[in-house]
From Swiss-Prot:
Function (record text): Glycosyltransferase that can synthesize all known mucin beta 6 N-acetylglucosaminides. Mediates core 2 and core 4 O-glycan branching, 2 important steps in mucin-type biosynthesis. Also has I-branching enzyme activity by converting linear into branched poly-N-acetyllactosaminoglycans, leading to introduce the blood group I antigen during embryonic development.
Keywords assigned: Disulfide bond, Glycoprotein, Glycosyltransferase, Golgi apparatus, Membrane, Signal-anchor, Transferase, Transmembrane, Transmembrane helix
Natural source organism: Bos taurus (Bovine)
A single Gene Ontology CC term: Golgi membrane
Protein name: Beta-1,3-galactosyl-O-glycosyl-glycoprotein beta-1,6-N-acetylglucosaminyltransferase 3
GO molecular function: acetylgalactosaminyl-O-glycosyl-glycoprotein beta-1,6-N-acetylglucosaminyltransferase activity; acetylglucosaminyltransferase activity; beta-1,3-galactosyl-O-glycosyl-glycoprotein beta-1,6-N-acetylglucosaminyltransferase activity; N-acetyllactosaminide beta-1,6-N-acetylglucosaminyltransferase activity
Residues carrying covalently attached carbohydrate according to the record: 72, 108
C-alpha cells in the first residue's frame, strides 16, 4: 500500500494521536488490500484510467448510502415532479416511517468501533491529496436526537479534519453517553473540554462555540477554516467541494452581515437576564464599545483560523464579546459585527456595498417563511415542501432540487421525523458525488 506520504502528514503531532492514527490507518490499509484489492493512491477523482474507475466502483459498492427502493433520488435531485410527489406521498404513510435509532442502539453498536464504522459506512481515509492538505475544523453543538447527530457527523466526516462536539449540559445522561460512545471511535472527534447549559436565544449558544474554538486552536491539526453546526444542519456539498469553496475565499470569512432593522436593534437596547429562559429587563445598555457599528446576521459562520484567533485574543473583540453577553440572541449579531470590524482578519468594510445576506454568504442555506413565494414574481425561493418551525422551513423532498442549486456549504433545517426521504436522497447524492465526482 502506497500510503506513506499522506500517512506521515495525517499522523504527525502528539504521540497518542499518532499511535491511534497509525492503528486506524493500518486497519484501513488491511481492509483495502483484502477487500478492495486496489491502492489508495489510485483513488484519484481526476483520473479516468480503468484501475481508478474499478477502485471507485468497488469503493462505492461498499460505502453507498442508498435511499429506500420506493424513492427515486436521481429524479428528486433533478426536480422531477413525479419523483417528488411520490416521495412526499410516501412520507405521509405512517406505516412506512422507520423509528429513529435510539441512544441505546448507539451505546451497543459502538462497543466494537470497527463494526460501527463499517456498518454505518463512514469514509475512513482521505479521498484526495487536495482534501488531505486542507483540513477543516467543525464546532458541533447538539442537545438531542442522537441519530441526527450521527448522520450529520458521517456526512461531514473526513479523517484529516477535526471535530469538537459540545453537548448541552441539560441533555439527558443517556444522550450524553451515546455521543461520547460515538466520538470515542474516532481519533479526530472529541468532546469540548467545557460544557455549558444552552438556553435558547441566550449567550450560552455563543459560549458553546467559543469553548470549541479554544479547544480546536490547541489541536495539532493544522486546520484552515472553522464551520459551526447545530443538530438540524446537513451539508449540501462534499468535503472536496467545501475545500474548493474555502480556498476560493482566499483567507476571507463568509457569513451574513447586514444593517439591522429597528426591530432587531431592540435586541441590544435593553439588558436581558437568564434563568431557565431569557428575561427582558428595563435596564438600558451603554453603546457598543470602540464606537463599533452593529450589524445583524445569523448564528452560522465560515471563519478563517486567523479570525478565530482574533475572536479569542484581540482586546477589542473581547470587549464586544463582554458587551453582547446580556443581549437577545447575541449569536445573530456578534459574528455579523466582528465580520465588519477592521481589526478582524478576513473581514469586510462597514460600507453598504459590503452588506452580505444569508443567500450571498456560503455558511447556511435557510428558507424563511416570510420570504417564500412565487419566484417569477420576485420571491427569493418557492414555498417550503415540508413544514415550518419558528418561521423556518424544515425541508421536504420537494426542496432538494432547489437546495442543490445553491452555493452554500450546509443547509438548515432537516428532521428525519418530518421528512426522512429528503435526507436519504441527500446522503445518497453526496456519497455518490464524493466517490465519483459526479451527480446521481
Amino acid at each position: 500500500m502506497k500510503m506513506t506520504g499522506w500517512k506521515k502528514k495525517l499522523c504527525r503531532g502528539h504521540h497518542l494521536w499518532a499511535l491511534g492514527c497509525y492503528m486506524l490507518l493500518a486497519v484501513v490499509a488491511l481492509r483495502l488490500s483484502l477487500r478492495l484489492k486496489c491502492d489508495v493512491d489510485s483513488l484519484d477523482l481526476e483520473s479516468r484510467d480503468f484501475q481508478s474507475q474499478r477502485c471507485r466502483d468497488v469503493l462505492y459498492k461498499n460505502l453507498k448510502l442508498p435511499a429506500k427502493r420506493s424513492i427515486n433520488c436521481s429524479g428528486i435531485t433533478r426536480g422531477d415532479q413525479e419523483a417528488v410527489v411520490q416521495a412526499l406521498l410516501d412520507n405521509l404513510e405512517v406505516k412506512k416511517k422507520r423509528l429513529p435509532f435510539t441512544d441505546t442502539y448507539y451505546l451497543n453498536i459502538t462497543r466494537d468501533c470497527e463494526q460501527f464504522k463499517a456498518q454505518r459506512k463512514f469514509i475512513q481515509f482521505p479521498l484526495s491529496k487536495e482534501e488531505l492538505d486542507f483540513p477543516i475544523a467543525y464546532s458541533m453543538v447538539v442537545h438531542e436526537k442522537i441519530e441526527n447527530f450521527e448522520r450529520l457527523l458521517r456526512a461531514v466526516y473526513a479523517p484529516q479534519n477535526i471535530y469538537c462536539v459540545h453537548v448541552d449540559v441539560k441533555s439527558p445522561e443517556t444522550f450524553k453517553e451515546a455521543v461520547k460512545a460515538i466520538i470515542s471511535c474516532f481519533p479526530n472527534v472529541f468532546m469540548a473540554s467545557k460544557l455549558v447549559p444552552v438556553v435558547y436565544a441566550s449567550w450560552s449558544r455563543v459560549q458553546a462555540d467559543l469553548n470549541c474554538m479554544e479547544d480546536l486552536l490547541q489541536s495539532s491539526v493544522p486546520w484552515k477554516y472553522l464551520l459551526n453546526t447545530c443538530g438540524t444542519d446537513f451539508p449540501i456539498k462534499t468535503n472536496a467541494e467545501m475545500v474548493l469553496a474555502l480556498k476560493m475565499l482566499n483567507g476571507k470569512n463568509s457569513m451574513e452581515s447586514e444593517i439591522p432593522s429597528e426591530y432587531k436593534k431592540n435586541r441590544w437596547k435593553y439588558r436581558y437576564e437568564v434563568t431557565d429562559r431569557l428575561y427582558l429587563t428595563s435596564k438600558m445598555k451603554d453603546p457598543p464599545p470602540d464606537n463599533l457599528p452593529m450589524f445583524t446576521g445569523n448564528a452560522y459562520f465560515v471563519a478563517s483560523r486567523a479570525f478565530v484567533q482574533h475572536v479569542l485574543e484581540n482586546p477589542k473583540s473581547q470587549r464586544l464579546i463582554e458587551w453582547v453577553k446580556d443581549t437577545y440572541s447575541p449569536d445573530e449579531h456578534l459574528w455579523a459585527t466582528l465580520q465588519r470590524a477592521p481589526w478582524m482578519p478576513g473581514s469586510v468594510p462597514y460600507h453598504p456595498k459590503y452588506h452580505i445576506s444569508d443567500m450571498t454568504a456560503i455558511a447556511r442555506l435557510v428558507k424563511w417563511q416570510g420570504h417564500e413565494g412565487d419566484v417569477s414574481m420576485g420571491a427569493p425561493y418557492a414555498p417550503c415542501s415540508g413544514i415550518h418551525q419558528r418561521a423556518i422551513c424544515i425541508y421536504g423532498a420537494g426542496d432538494l432540487h432547489w437546495i442543490l442549486q445553491n452555493h452554500h456549504l450546509l443547509a438548515n433545517k432537516f428532521d428525519p421525523r418530518v421528512d426522512d426521504n429528503v435526507l436519504q436522497c441527500l446522503e445518497e447524492y453526496l456519497r455518490h458525488k464524493a466517490i465519483y465526482g459526479t451527480e446521481l
